[in-house]
Amino acid sequence: MPLSMLQRGESGVVKSIHGKPKDIHHLADLGLVVGATVKAVNEVAGNLIIEVKGSRLAMNKVMANRIILEV
């Protein structure tokens, strides 16, 4: 399921990331890679706040739709 559908407090494991290579590389620099566990923390102004590898990140829903999780 896409990361954008994760509800607050739920977690999932990244199975695939779709998008431009530069975007995928940027996400990898932030710790968001295949196999990483992601937790939905909050939603603010249409952006998702997620926690990955101990850090919190804000992400718009367009990008969150490109990240596929196994819940």
What are these regions (language model features)?
Residues 1-71:
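Compact, glycine-rich, soluble single-domain proteins
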